[in-house]
Amino acid sequence: MTGSHPSGTPRGGSNPASGPAHLIVSFANTLILEPEETDLLRTREEAAGWLHTAALLPAEAGLSNSEHAALLRLRASIRDVLTAHTEGREDPGAAARLTRALADGRLVITVGPASTVRLASAARASYPSLVADVAVAVADSAAAGSWLRLKSCAAPRCGRAFYDSASSGTRCPAHPA
């Protein structure tokens, strides 16, 4: 399964993993809790700027109030699921919220002339397309085996998303000890 998503790191992201996991980590890390809280998606304009940099939203596109609110819910639901990964537990509520948020992507399977198969958004609007890119990143990271290794730091006031490459437990790059 392949998807189309950016490989660059916009502001607020780190590159602990590559490909689809990188997009998820970068998006989750648009909310930074320490040393002081910084929300890179705080306003519609700031969110659009970050999304433009991440190549998730066309340069001429913006976000409506309802799309901005949905974007914040999408990020929160991803962060909740990553927290569950960190704690090694299932969280049916977080999984259901993420499922609802990703449904805005309206994914379909497309088949190209050479029988190449990919997931894409059935919508032509910018917001559903960016959600589809995030949904494809989740699906691709699950297929690659990296989805459950995406976690959030358990340290108080950190919450940084990261790819856990430690073989003996969770290690946030900001709190390696």
Which role fits each region the language model picked out?
Residues S168-A177:
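Cysteine-rich micro-motifs
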Residues M1-S152, P156-Y163:
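Short helix-coil boundary/hinge micro-motifs
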